[in-house]
């Protein structure tokens, strides 16, 4: 007898649960108010590098003359700070001299023009994607002199700050104490009562660093703004804390955010703000001689925020000259052939099916300067 082969039994498998498919949405990244697209490949024409030294700024006590504001002092050592004594206690300096106050240094860079920058769909802008910065400092030993045979060095409060952005740095106005008012000349002080400005509140004034008259003791970077900006700062306190400054040309700072986008120069400008303090010696504030920047740019495409209609109205349809013209002039509108009348004169003329019987000339009175003095309707 021949035996029949056994059929293999089918395994009972459980139905595999279907993994739900996650719906992927198009990622739209906005920065500086525009939609950011891809970066332009690097080449000699799409990359740009600039180096600059930014000098420290000390306020000026000179009053304004002939309506012109005093220029800042580009010093590395301030004037002597004088304490006001009342009996045995030292009062807080409420209105210090401007030449004892460190202000934010400001620099502006205009990258070169990009050929064929704007198209109907997108436009190319410069993007700052990495940088190097360091302080220009030297050790101070003999330069500080000695007292009673003891050589003194720098010590005290220190500040290290820099910022780069496509717009000027946004700052908030605060005061260190409820009595501090700031210098009476040169510097721009926060408006308001110092008793309410020494802590942040809804009435805290906000501003942009558009000049070198903003004191570091009265204005601080605004963390709620500065979207298209990168800044870094460090404050070291202590009456006898010596400065520790490291410098070298082997460190690079990337400026890309979590989406891989750097600082966009949407207005064709890059604004650099910095302020540094090494400490005090002999009642004077010492700063570095300068802060060095090496900036690396590349080109980035962004979605064109302007339609052709907007460009036509803002660029081409704008009068080249501003004149003070008459407003009570008479406009003559010619109505030719048979066609609908302008809405502005339909209510003043009798309606009729046969428009050829209507007047061919209509006179209107205008109360504003006229742009189009003659209108032809077919």
Curated annotation (Swiss-Prot):
Chain residue ranges for the region called Disordered: 1-21
Gene3D superfamilies: Capsid protein VP1,Polyomavirus
Single GO biological process annotation from the record: virion attachment to host cell
GO CC aspect terms: host cell nucleus; T=7 icosahedral viral capsid
Annotated keywords: Capsid protein, Disulfide bond, Host nucleus, Host-virus interaction, Late protein, T=7 icosahedral capsid protein, Viral attachment to host cell, Viral penetration into host cytoplasm, Virion, Virus endocytosis by host, Virus entry into host cell
Gene Ontology MF terms: structural molecule activity
UniProt key word Disulfide bond: yes
Pfam family name, one: Polyoma_coat
Localisation: Virion; Host nucleus
Family per similarity comment: Belongs to the polyomaviruses coat protein VP1 family.
Function: Forms an icosahedral capsid with a T=7 symmetry and a 40 nm diameter. The capsid is composed of 72 pentamers linked to each other by disulfide bonds and associated with VP2 or VP3 proteins. Interacts with sialic acids on the cell surface to provide virion attachment to target cell. Once attached, the virion is internalized by endocytosis and traffics to the endoplasmic reticulum. Inside the endoplasmic reticulum, the protein folding machinery isomerizes VP1 interpentamer disulfide bonds, thereby triggering initial uncoating.
Subunit structure: Homomultimer. The virus capsid is composed of 72 icosahedral units, each one composed of five disulfide-linked copies of VP1. Interacts with minor capsid proteins VP2 and VP3.
Annotated protein name in UniProt: Major capsid protein VP1
